[in-house]
Amino acid sequence: MEAPPAAGVPTECTPAVAGAEVRCPGPTPLRLLEWKVAAGATVRIGSVLAVCETAASAQPAGPAPARAASGGCVRAARTERRLRSERAGVVRELCAQPGQVVAPGALLVRLEGCSHPVVMKGLCAECGQDLTQLQSKNGRQQVPLSTATVSMVHSVPELMVSSEQAEKLGREDQQRLHRNRKLVLMVDLDQTLIHTTEQHCPQMSNKGIFHFQLGRGEPMLHTRLRPHCKDFLEKIAKLYELHVFTFGSRLYAHTIAGFLDPEKKLFSHRILSRDECIDPFSKTGNLRNLFPCGDSMVCIIDDREDVWKFAPNLITVKKYVYFPGTGDVNAPPAARETQARRKVNHSSKGGDALEQALSVRDPEDGRPAPGVEHSNGLGKASRELNGGEAVPGVFPSKADEKEAWPLTRASPASSSSGHEPTEAPELPVSCEWDGRTTPGVQPTQGDAATQDLDFDLSSDSESSESSSRSEGQRAPAPQERTKAAPEHSGPQDTSGGRAAASPLGESGPSIHPHDKGSDLDTQEEGERDSLCGLGNGSVDRKEAETESQNSEQSGVTAGESLDQSVGEEEEEDTDDDDHLIHLEEILVRVHTDYYTKYDRYLNKELEEAPDIRKIVPELKSKVLADVAVIFSGLHPTNFPVEKTREHYHATALGAKVLTQLVLSPDAPDRATHLIAARAGTEKVRQAQECKHLHVVSPDWLWSCLERWDKVEEQLFPLIDDDTRTHRDNSPAVFPDRHSVLPTALFHPTPIHSKAHPGPEVRIYDSNTGKLIRMGPQGSAPAPSSAPLNHGEPSSFRAVQPHQQQMFGEELPESQDGEQPGPARRKRQPSMSEAMPLYTLCKEDLESMDKEVDDILGEGSDDSDIEKKKPEDQDNEQERAPKPRKPRAPGIRREQPVGLPSSGERSTPGMRGPRGHKRKLNEEDAASESSGESSNDDEEGSSSEADEMAAALEAELNDLM
């Protein structure tokens, strides 16, 4: 029988940890026969507290022998009953003795309610109560107050413990670390130890690159391990307890951890992903849960400071970039928006609307529509990527694994063994055969090549390194590719081989590059496009099962698609990143300094225990302790220098930042280093005259930060010709290093040496559009309207010495004995020759001219031409004796009637500006109209004709 709730039972607003009282139930008295619990015992709901008996004639008062004298009628009426608890808790006090008769409603037991110190997915691990299904009388949900608020297990955020128990566990962890002389190291993945991209770069070597998929239909991910990564982890693991903390998804984090630590000796279960993050924009919120006693023994390495809120125990790592155009694929949304302004990312895969607007989720990490950014290497919906509606802490079951990973299945032995997935020979991912590309894969590689041209890298050094790596590596030979194919023909299978062949379908020698490539590529792209728009469809269902696959799928779903025989023949990898070597030295210094102070603390030489949050800034501030720096050109003059990144890191390294340049070597506030962005500023010119002042580039400061050491200033000199280099590379300026004086880009008129016979020239009436004259070009030289000075330097269109060979076949040969003059100067190249990309070719222009001539010449007939001939003769005879000023070049009117003239602008090598033809037609029309008026008006004097001609000439000269 269950005791009814007494008056002392906690109400809805009373905390569950308050004491509860169990009273005697029913309207009849009970005799207590036996207690089933003792003081301090833990009871659950339904646990038996005591065994009682009831008697109808039993009297609650009087001595026991007197009550027993009533005889067997009482014994016959009594019935044993079990008193059960309807609450969980700990027995605080037993309020009755065995054999005592308890009146109805009398107090029997005082209980201390369960505080639910350990809760797993809403169930109390102590009392078993479901804390999510309690309903109050009025229908509102009544959730008992639980003290379990701390999640201490990395990959199981649903397991909560109380703060008291968390502190107890935290103290035990600290004692264990002190016994083992270790510290804690929080390790970031993306752009710290690895670099991941969705883009396949066939030009790059496959050495050290893992190719894998996180799910069926998901895009292939390519991960490159940073050089010296595994050696770094193995050495540091002897001094630090390694914890992984990444903004990638849980499956992504465990997969990468399987590459770095296949035997699970380095990280074990200490892997924290985005799915367990309390704050999606910061990593500091989880430190309180993981280390309830404080993070005084925790050191952090990450390439970004903002996600840690510039924590003092953070060691900033140089960003690792191997794939050009890709930053941190798992950066938080705030960093995506920043990186989207600097990058242009065109991807062929679709994504959700949020990620299309935010670009990268790293660094360095949304996507600009219609492209796709590499958020965690997946085209998932934003709700799932941020842990919206997906159930955290779950993984596909083994039944669903066979369906979800058909292309990456492997035996459990291969994944659980201590060997890396690179030991079995596999098919290479790239599909080049005999120097040709598989037709089905060619569009994908073409897109990748287009993306390489559109990407805007964050720095020039990264761009140059990536381009040099791409150029220096080649694809494996076709013979080596064919050798690897028969090895997969048997029933044996490896995870790496499946993962490597997954982009192409099923692995095996049956794949032919010409008959299967197109179909497989079409099928793959169709699956990707259809699955990328599903939102929370199959992926949510896949994550809503169980998390029992944490350790298995990291080795099953992915593998390094490297054929060892192919890798031996490839060129050496040109990735010379050695930052982890310097980072190892820094971590060793931190570890040594900590335990040196800890030993002194044990000997009571120090009053307080050492703290990593004080040791890291202390060691860092000694790097540039004797340096005073001043900045030039790194930030706008109206921007406070204290808010710049250079000022933050310079002061963190111990340098003193000055704002005024003091040139006196004896001044106490003089600067020792000038960090300038460009040469030519006033500060740089003054500093270069001082021998005691080092003028360096900003790379010197970043190198000191990366190594925690003062590097040599001679390695980072300030380049003096930064401005000149930028001016020469400008597309708007033609390079002319031989000219000294500033010159104009274009001359008003071209200068021709002499006339050359051309095919033909046609002259049309500007008013009627009819053909006036056509014929071969004459040999009369064209006078120059504005001859150049001989001493004038060459301009944009002048032929440079290195360009004379280019135009040598078209330059006229000078005659012997002739004096050089304006008419004999070598011609300048035309627009089509100097800038061929900005003009049409000669054949196109000639075909356009002929087409226009045919259209305009259809209406003209022979009578019109013959009618114009006597008028032209009269006009030329009248104008012949008159003194004339030199005409603009390219205008010819001195041709006799019988000899048709030709213009030199039709000559391929002598093409002039296009406006000359229009101006020639205008002059012809004006001359003809003036000739007609002179014939009609015989009284007009010659002086008026001269004035009109002079005015016309002046107007033409102004136009030219």
From Swiss-Prot:
UniProt modification remark: Phosphorylated. In the presence of TFIIF, the phosphorylated form has an increased CTD phosphatase activity. The phosphorylation is required for the physical interaction with GTF2F1.
Localization recorded for this chain is: Nucleus; Cytoplasm, Cytoskeleton, Microtubule organizing center, Centrosome; Cytoplasm, Cytoskeleton, Spindle; Cytoplasm, Cytoskeleton, Spindle pole
SMART domains per UniProt? BRCT, CPDc
Q: Which Gene3D superfamilies match?
A: 2.40.50.100, BRCT domain, HAD superfamily/HAD-like, S15/NS1, RNA-binding
* EC numbers for this chain: 3.1.3.16
- Broad EC category: hydrolase
* SUPFAM superfamilies linked: BRCT domain, HAD-like, Single hybrid motif
**N-acetylmethionine PTM sites in chain numbering:** 1
Q: Which GO terms describe its molecular function?
A: RNA polymerase II CTD heptapeptide repeat phosphatase activity; Tat protein binding; TFIIF-class transcription factor complex binding
Record's GO cellular component terms:
centrosome; cytoplasm; midbody; nucleoplasm; protein-containing complex; spindle; spindle midzone; spindle pole
Q: What is this protein called?
A: RNA polymerase II subunit A C-terminal domain phosphatase
Q: What is the protein's species of origin?
A: Mus musculus
